[in-house]
């Protein structure tokens, strides 16, 4: 499933090295420019927010959580279509993320094709 026409960055924020690497490889395999960050703080310090077309973020991370990152970006009027991924989500967390503007909320492990479809939707939003 190639996703064409995107030149803006897809940012991956996850504290798990293997997950970051796998997601970055998946996105690059379909022709999408992806950059991985080990924490929300690292992403914010990178200055890449305005160049980011889609954010894939873990919910639970040391330091700033994915939900806190989304709230900070929203407060700075930086609305990035966000896909949350988590190994430990619940219905309340899902609703909180979606109400704050998330495009999708996915439980790990997830199907690669479902994630890529969510990225496509995010890029079109």
Predicted features and spans:
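Two-component/phosphorelay signaling modules centered on CheY-like receiver
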Residues: 17-35
